[in-house]
Amino acid sequence: MAGDFYEILGVSRDCGKDELKRAYRRLARQYHPDVNKDPGAEEKFKEINRAYEVLSEPETRARYDRFGEAGVSGAGAAGADYGDMGGFADIFETIFSGFGGMGTGATGGGRRRSGPMRGDDLRLDLKLDFKEAIFGGEKEIRIPHLETCKTCSGSGAKAGTSANTCGTCNGTGQVRRATRTPFGSFAQVSVCPTCNGEGQVIAEKCESCGGAGRKQETKKLKITIPAGVDSGTRLRVSREGDAGVKGGPPGDLYVYLAVNADKEFRRDGTNILSEIEISYLQAILGDTVKVKTVDGTEDLTIPAGLQPNKVLILEGKGVPKLGNPVSRGDHLITVKVMIPTKVSREEKELLHQLAKLKGTEHSKGGFEGLLGNLFHNK
Protein backbone atom coordinates (compact mmCIF):
# COMPACT_ATOMS: atom_id res chain seq x y z
CA MET A 1 0.00 0.00 0.00
CA ALA A 2 1.48 3.29 -1.03
CA GLY A 3 0.70 6.30 1.13
CA ASP A 4 -1.26 7.12 4.24
CA PHE A 5 -4.87 5.85 4.32
CA TYR A 6 -6.19 9.28 5.33
CA GLU A 7 -4.27 10.92 2.48
CA ILE A 8 -5.59 8.33 0.00
CA LEU A 9 -9.17 9.29 0.91
CA GLY A 10 -8.31 12.99 1.20
CA VAL A 11 -9.62 13.39 4.75
CA SER A 12 -8.14 14.59 8.03
CA ARG A 13 -7.19 12.16 10.80
CA ASP A 14 -10.05 13.37 12.99
CA CYS A 15 -12.75 13.15 10.31
CA GLY A 16 -16.15 11.71 11.20
CA LYS A 17 -17.86 8.63 9.78
CA ASP A 18 -20.12 10.61 7.43
CA GLU A 19 -17.25 12.64 5.99
CA LEU A 20 -15.27 9.44 5.48
CA LYS A 21 -18.16 7.79 3.64
CA ARG A 22 -18.70 10.82 1.39
CA ALA A 23 -15.02 10.90 0.44
CA TYR A 24 -15.08 7.18 -0.29
CA ARG A 25 -18.19 7.39 -2.47
CA ARG A 26 -16.73 10.24 -4.49
CA LEU A 27 -13.39 8.51 -5.11
CA ALA A 28 -14.91 5.07 -5.71
CA ARG A 29 -17.19 6.53 -8.38
CA GLN A 30 -14.20 8.27 -9.99
CA TYR A 31 -11.81 5.30 -10.06
CA HIS A 32 -14.05 2.24 -10.41
CA PRO A 33 -12.53 0.09 -13.23
CA ASP A 34 -15.90 -0.22 -14.95
CA VAL A 35 -16.06 3.57 -15.22
CA ASN A 36 -12.44 4.73 -15.41
CA LYS A 37 -10.40 3.01 -18.12
CA ASP A 38 -7.07 4.68 -17.25
CA PRO A 39 -4.24 2.13 -16.70
CA GLY A 40 -3.74 3.14 -13.06
CA ALA A 41 -7.42 3.36 -12.13
CA GLU A 42 -7.77 -0.23 -10.98
CA GLU A 43 -4.78 -0.01 -8.62
CA LYS A 44 -6.03 3.31 -7.29
CA PHE A 45 -9.47 1.78 -6.73
CA LYS A 46 -7.90 -1.02 -4.71
CA GLU A 47 -6.05 1.52 -2.54
CA ILE A 48 -9.27 3.46 -1.93
CA ASN A 49 -11.09 0.22 -1.06
CA ARG A 50 -8.39 -0.84 1.38
CA ALA A 51 -8.20 2.57 3.04
CA TYR A 52 -11.97 2.72 3.61
CA GLU A 53 -12.09 -0.88 4.76
CA VAL A 54 -9.66 -0.05 7.59
CA LEU A 55 -10.88 3.44 8.54
CA SER A 56 -14.61 2.67 8.44
CA GLU A 57 -14.34 0.20 11.33
CA PRO A 58 -13.61 1.89 14.70
CA GLU A 59 -11.50 -1.02 15.97
CA THR A 60 -9.23 -1.30 12.93
CA ARG A 61 -9.04 2.48 12.65
CA ALA A 62 -7.80 2.71 16.24
CA ARG A 63 -5.14 0.08 15.54
CA TYR A 64 -4.08 1.90 12.37
CA ASP A 65 -3.83 5.22 14.22
CA ARG A 66 -1.61 3.59 16.82
CA PHE A 67 0.56 1.19 14.83
CA GLY A 68 0.21 2.19 11.18
CA GLU A 69 -0.38 -0.41 8.47
CA ALA A 70 1.54 -3.05 10.46
CA GLY A 71 -1.31 -2.93 12.99
CA VAL A 72 -4.00 -3.78 10.45
CA SER A 73 -2.15 -6.04 8.03
CA GLY A 74 -4.41 -8.94 8.96
CA ALA A 75 -7.56 -6.95 8.20
CA GLY A 76 -8.19 -7.81 4.59
CA ALA A 77 -5.68 -7.28 1.81
CA ALA A 78 -4.97 -4.49 -0.60
CA GLY A 79 -5.43 -6.78 -3.54
CA ALA A 80 -8.77 -8.29 -2.51
CA ASP A 81 -11.01 -8.93 -5.49
CA TYR A 82 -14.27 -7.09 -5.98
CA GLY A 83 -16.44 -10.17 -5.47
CA ASP A 84 -16.15 -9.99 -1.67
CA MET A 85 -17.56 -6.53 -1.08
CA GLY A 86 -19.25 -7.35 2.21
CA GLY A 87 -20.34 -4.12 3.93
CA PHE A 88 -19.36 -2.01 0.92
CA ALA A 89 -22.32 -3.19 -1.10
CA ASP A 90 -24.79 -0.62 0.21
CA ILE A 91 -22.40 2.18 -0.68
CA PHE A 92 -21.77 0.83 -4.16
CA GLU A 93 -25.47 0.48 -4.83
CA THR A 94 -25.78 4.21 -4.14
CA ILE A 95 -22.65 5.16 -6.05
CA PHE A 96 -23.54 3.35 -9.24
CA SER A 97 -27.32 3.63 -9.19
CA GLY A 98 -27.03 6.06 -12.11
CA PHE A 99 -25.11 3.62 -14.29
CA GLY A 100 -27.68 1.39 -15.99
CA GLY A 101 -27.44 -2.23 -14.99
CA MET A 102 -24.29 -1.72 -12.96
CA GLY A 103 -24.35 -2.67 -9.32
CA THR A 104 -23.15 -5.22 -6.87
CA GLY A 105 -25.28 -7.80 -8.61
CA ALA A 106 -22.58 -7.79 -11.27
CA THR A 107 -20.14 -9.26 -8.79
CA GLY A 108 -19.88 -12.88 -7.81
CA GLY A 109 -22.01 -14.49 -5.13
CA GLY A 110 -21.33 -13.85 -1.48
CA ARG A 111 -18.17 -15.56 -0.37
CA ARG A 112 -18.06 -17.07 3.09
CA ARG A 113 -15.77 -15.19 5.43
CA SER A 114 -15.77 -17.59 8.37
CA GLY A 115 -12.69 -19.66 7.50
CA PRO A 116 -9.31 -19.53 9.23
CA MET A 117 -7.77 -16.06 9.24
CA ARG A 118 -4.21 -15.01 9.98
CA GLY A 119 -3.69 -13.00 13.15
CA ASP A 120 -2.71 -9.34 13.04
CA ASP A 121 0.91 -8.25 12.98
CA LEU A 122 2.02 -6.21 15.98
CA ARG A 123 4.52 -3.38 16.41
CA LEU A 124 6.78 -2.78 19.40
CA ASP A 125 9.08 0.24 19.77
CA LEU A 126 12.21 -0.68 21.71
CA LYS A 127 14.98 1.60 22.99
CA LEU A 128 18.57 0.37 23.23
CA ASP A 129 21.64 1.77 24.90
CA PHE A 130 24.50 2.77 22.59
CA LYS A 131 26.63 -0.29 23.37
CA GLU A 132 23.64 -2.67 23.20
CA ALA A 133 23.12 -1.58 19.60
CA ILE A 134 26.79 -2.09 18.77
CA PHE A 135 27.35 -5.52 20.30
CA GLY A 136 23.79 -6.90 20.27
CA GLY A 137 22.62 -9.62 22.62
CA GLU A 138 19.40 -10.91 24.12
CA LYS A 139 16.65 -8.59 25.30
CA GLU A 140 13.61 -9.56 27.34
CA ILE A 141 10.41 -7.82 26.31
CA ARG A 142 6.75 -7.93 27.31
CA ILE A 143 4.05 -7.67 24.67
CA PRO A 144 0.26 -7.54 25.04
CA HIS A 145 -1.33 -9.64 22.32
CA LEU A 146 -4.26 -11.91 21.58
CA GLU A 147 -3.68 -15.58 22.37
CA THR A 148 -5.90 -18.52 21.49
CA CYS A 149 -8.24 -19.22 24.38
CA LYS A 150 -7.02 -22.35 26.16
CA THR A 151 -10.46 -23.12 27.57
CA CYS A 152 -12.26 -23.49 24.23
CA SER A 153 -9.17 -23.98 22.01
CA GLY A 154 -10.25 -20.99 19.93
CA SER A 155 -13.75 -22.19 19.03
CA GLY A 156 -15.49 -19.61 21.21
CA ALA A 157 -18.03 -22.22 22.32
CA LYS A 158 -18.61 -23.55 25.81
CA ALA A 159 -16.99 -26.91 26.56
CA GLY A 160 -19.14 -29.74 25.21
CA THR A 161 -20.91 -27.50 22.68
CA SER A 162 -20.11 -26.25 19.20
CA ALA A 163 -21.06 -23.45 16.84
CA ASN A 164 -24.11 -23.92 14.58
CA THR A 165 -24.57 -22.84 10.99
CA CYS A 166 -26.32 -19.48 10.86
CA GLY A 167 -29.94 -19.91 9.77
CA THR A 168 -30.21 -16.39 8.39
CA CYS A 169 -27.43 -16.62 5.80
CA ASN A 170 -27.05 -20.43 5.65
CA GLY A 171 -23.39 -20.13 6.54
CA THR A 172 -22.34 -17.66 3.84
CA GLY A 173 -21.89 -14.74 6.24
CA GLN A 174 -23.78 -12.46 3.85
CA VAL A 175 -27.37 -11.64 3.00
CA ARG A 176 -28.62 -10.43 -0.39
CA ARG A 177 -31.57 -8.23 -1.26
CA ALA A 178 -32.75 -7.80 -4.84
CA THR A 179 -33.95 -4.37 -5.99
CA ARG A 180 -35.60 -3.58 -9.34
CA THR A 181 -35.32 -0.08 -10.82
CA PRO A 182 -36.01 1.44 -14.27
CA PHE A 183 -32.26 1.13 -14.86
CA GLY A 184 -32.05 -2.58 -14.17
CA SER A 185 -31.85 -5.08 -11.33
CA PHE A 186 -29.49 -4.66 -8.43
CA ALA A 187 -28.50 -7.02 -5.67
CA GLN A 188 -27.49 -5.48 -2.37
CA VAL A 189 -25.06 -7.70 -0.48
CA SER A 190 -24.38 -6.97 3.18
CA VAL A 191 -22.92 -8.63 6.24
CA CYS A 192 -25.35 -10.99 7.92
CA PRO A 193 -26.71 -9.20 11.01
CA THR A 194 -27.26 -12.46 12.87
CA CYS A 195 -23.77 -13.95 12.72
CA ASN A 196 -21.82 -10.75 11.95
CA GLY A 197 -20.40 -12.31 8.80
CA GLU A 198 -19.03 -15.41 10.54
CA GLY A 199 -21.47 -17.88 9.00
CA GLN A 200 -21.87 -19.57 12.37
CA VAL A 201 -23.71 -18.79 15.59
CA ILE A 202 -22.47 -19.78 19.03
CA ALA A 203 -25.44 -20.61 21.25
CA GLU A 204 -23.41 -21.10 24.45
CA LYS A 205 -20.31 -18.95 24.53
CA CYS A 206 -17.09 -19.84 26.30
CA GLU A 207 -17.09 -18.10 29.68
CA SER A 208 -13.34 -17.53 29.56
CA CYS A 209 -13.15 -15.56 26.29
CA GLY A 210 -16.79 -14.51 25.87
CA GLY A 211 -17.07 -16.40 22.59
CA ALA A 212 -14.21 -14.55 20.87
CA GLY A 213 -11.91 -17.58 20.78
CA ARG A 214 -8.99 -15.35 21.78
CA LYS A 215 -7.93 -13.54 24.95
CA GLN A 216 -5.72 -10.53 25.58
CA GLU A 217 -2.59 -11.68 27.39
CA THR A 218 0.80 -10.18 28.19
CA LYS A 219 3.65 -12.40 27.13
CA LYS A 220 7.32 -12.30 28.07
CA LEU A 221 9.81 -13.37 25.45
CA LYS A 222 13.48 -12.99 24.66
CA ILE A 223 14.55 -11.60 21.33
CA THR A 224 18.01 -11.55 19.81
CA ILE A 225 19.39 -8.13 18.90
CA PRO A 226 22.01 -8.51 16.13
CA ALA A 227 25.29 -6.63 16.51
CA GLY A 228 25.43 -3.38 14.54
CA VAL A 229 21.77 -2.33 14.61
CA ASP A 230 20.89 1.37 14.54
CA SER A 231 17.88 3.62 15.04
CA GLY A 232 15.26 2.69 12.46
CA THR A 233 16.30 -0.95 12.22
CA ARG A 234 13.25 -3.22 12.09
CA LEU A 235 13.38 -6.76 13.44
CA ARG A 236 10.76 -9.36 12.54
CA VAL A 237 9.90 -11.95 15.17
CA SER A 238 7.96 -14.64 13.35
CA ARG A 239 4.61 -15.85 14.73
CA GLU A 240 4.66 -13.64 17.83
CA GLY A 241 1.80 -11.35 16.76
CA ASP A 242 -1.88 -11.89 17.53
CA ALA A 243 -3.19 -15.44 17.38
CA GLY A 244 -5.09 -16.40 14.25
CA VAL A 245 -8.85 -16.86 14.09
CA LYS A 246 -10.43 -20.30 13.72
CA GLY A 247 -7.09 -22.07 13.45
CA GLY A 248 -5.43 -19.45 11.26
CA PRO A 249 -1.69 -18.80 11.71
CA PRO A 250 -0.52 -16.09 14.11
CA GLY A 251 0.78 -12.78 12.84
CA ASP A 252 4.33 -11.53 13.27
CA LEU A 253 5.85 -9.08 15.73
CA TYR A 254 7.81 -6.17 14.26
CA VAL A 255 10.29 -4.53 16.63
CA TYR A 256 11.39 -1.00 15.69
CA LEU A 257 14.65 0.03 17.35
CA ALA A 258 15.72 3.44 18.63
CA VAL A 259 19.26 3.87 20.00
CA ASN A 260 19.90 6.25 22.88
CA ALA A 261 22.64 8.86 22.47
CA ASP A 262 25.92 8.35 24.35
CA LYS A 263 27.79 11.03 26.32
CA GLU A 264 31.19 10.15 24.85
CA PHE A 265 30.63 8.44 21.52
CA ARG A 266 28.81 9.27 18.31
CA ARG A 267 28.16 7.05 15.34
CA ASP A 268 28.67 7.57 11.62
CA GLY A 269 27.67 4.40 9.80
CA THR A 270 30.06 1.72 11.04
CA ASN A 271 32.53 4.27 12.45
CA ILE A 272 32.54 5.60 15.99
CA LEU A 273 33.54 9.21 16.63
CA SER A 274 34.90 10.77 19.82
CA GLU A 275 37.21 13.57 21.00
CA ILE A 276 40.12 13.83 23.43
CA GLU A 277 42.10 16.76 24.78
CA ILE A 278 45.90 16.87 25.10
CA SER A 279 48.34 19.57 26.19
CA TYR A 280 50.37 21.62 23.73
CA LEU A 281 53.52 19.91 25.01
CA GLN A 282 52.07 16.48 24.23
CA ALA A 283 51.21 17.73 20.75
CA ILE A 284 54.77 19.05 20.24
CA LEU A 285 56.73 16.20 21.81
CA GLY A 286 54.37 13.28 21.19
CA ASP A 287 53.02 10.86 23.78
CA THR A 288 51.00 7.71 24.41
CA VAL A 289 47.65 8.32 26.09
CA LYS A 290 44.78 6.16 27.33
CA VAL A 291 41.48 6.61 25.48
CA LYS A 292 38.03 5.14 26.03
CA THR A 293 36.51 2.95 23.33
CA VAL A 294 33.41 0.77 23.22
CA ASP A 295 35.74 -2.19 23.88
CA GLY A 296 37.33 -0.57 26.94
CA THR A 297 40.50 1.48 27.45
CA GLU A 298 43.05 1.49 24.62
CA ASP A 299 46.49 3.08 24.08
CA LEU A 300 46.62 5.85 21.48
CA THR A 301 49.94 7.08 20.11
CA ILE A 302 50.21 10.86 19.72
CA PRO A 303 52.87 11.56 17.07
CA ALA A 304 55.27 14.45 17.71
CA GLY A 305 54.20 17.68 16.04
CA LEU A 306 50.51 16.79 16.00
CA GLN A 307 48.34 19.60 14.65
CA PRO A 308 45.13 20.71 16.40
CA ASN A 309 41.93 18.84 15.37
CA LYS A 310 43.90 16.04 13.78
CA VAL A 311 41.89 12.81 13.49
CA LEU A 312 43.65 9.66 14.67
CA ILE A 313 42.27 6.22 13.85
CA LEU A 314 41.94 3.06 15.91
CA GLU A 315 41.27 0.47 13.23
CA GLY A 316 38.68 -2.22 13.83
CA LYS A 317 37.32 -0.56 16.98
CA GLY A 318 34.10 0.71 15.40
CA VAL A 319 30.65 -0.79 14.85
CA PRO A 320 30.27 -4.38 13.61
CA LYS A 321 28.73 -4.60 10.16
CA LEU A 322 25.10 -5.69 10.43
CA GLY A 323 24.92 -9.29 9.24
CA ASN A 324 28.71 -9.70 9.33
CA PRO A 325 29.86 -8.89 12.88
CA VAL A 326 33.42 -10.03 12.17
CA SER A 327 33.87 -6.94 9.98
CA ARG A 328 34.03 -3.73 12.01
CA GLY A 329 34.44 -0.06 11.26
CA ASP A 330 37.02 2.22 12.87
CA HIS A 331 37.11 4.53 15.87
CA LEU A 332 37.95 8.07 14.72
CA ILE A 333 39.35 10.30 17.45
CA THR A 334 39.58 14.06 16.99
CA VAL A 335 42.46 15.46 19.04
CA LYS A 336 41.94 18.88 20.64
CA VAL A 337 45.17 20.68 21.62
CA MET A 338 44.67 22.75 24.76
CA ILE A 339 46.67 26.00 24.78
CA PRO A 340 47.08 27.42 28.30
CA THR A 341 46.03 31.01 28.92
CA LYS A 342 48.50 31.38 31.81
CA VAL A 343 51.89 29.82 32.56
CA SER A 344 54.36 30.19 35.40
CA ARG A 345 57.33 32.55 35.17
CA GLU A 346 59.72 29.61 34.78
CA GLU A 347 57.64 28.11 31.97
CA LYS A 348 57.46 31.46 30.21
CA GLU A 349 61.25 31.92 30.38
CA LEU A 350 61.81 28.47 28.95
CA LEU A 351 59.35 29.15 26.15
CA HIS A 352 61.10 32.46 25.37
CA GLN A 353 64.41 30.65 25.21
CA LEU A 354 62.93 28.04 22.90
CA ALA A 355 61.42 30.74 20.70
CA LYS A 356 64.80 32.54 20.46
CA LEU A 357 66.52 29.28 19.71
CA LYS A 358 64.13 28.67 16.82
CA GLY A 359 64.34 32.32 15.76
CA THR A 360 60.55 32.63 15.72
CA GLU A 361 59.74 34.69 18.80
CA HIS A 362 58.18 37.53 16.81
CA SER A 363 57.30 35.77 13.56
CA LYS A 364 53.72 34.85 12.77
CA GLY A 365 52.88 31.20 12.56
CA GLY A 366 55.75 30.05 14.78
CA PHE A 367 55.55 29.25 18.45
CA GLU A 368 53.90 32.57 19.09
CA GLY A 369 51.27 31.69 16.48
CA LEU A 370 50.73 28.32 18.08
CA LEU A 371 50.54 29.66 21.63
CA GLY A 372 48.50 32.78 20.88
CA ASN A 373 49.15 35.67 23.28
CA LEU A 374 50.92 33.51 25.81
CA PHE A 375 54.18 35.52 25.59
CA HIS A 376 52.38 38.82 26.16
CA ASN A 377 50.58 37.90 29.38
CA LYS A 378 51.74 40.11 32.22
Swiss-Prot record:
It comes from the Bacteria. Keywords: Chaperone, Cytoplasm, DNA replication, Metal-binding, Repeat, Stress response, Zinc, Zinc-finger. Homodimer. It holds the Pfam family DnaJ. This is Chaperone protein DnaJ. One of its GO terms (cellular component) is cytoplasm. Its main location: cytoplasm. The lineage of its organism: Bacteria, Bacillati, Cyanobacteriota, Cyanophyceae, Oscillatoriophycideae. Coiled coil: none annotated. Binds 2 Zn(2+) ions per monomer. Zn(2+) 1 binds at C149, C152, C206, C209. One of its GO terms (biological process) is protein refolding. InterPro entries: DnaJ (IPR012724), DnaJ_C (IPR002939), DnaJ_domain (IPR001623), HSP40/DnaJ_pept-bd (IPR008971), HSP_DnaJ_Cys-rich_dom (IPR001305), HSP_DnaJ_Cys-rich_dom_sf (IPR036410), J_dom_sf (IPR036869). Residues 4-68 form the J domain. Zn(2+) 2 binds at C166, C169, C192, C195.
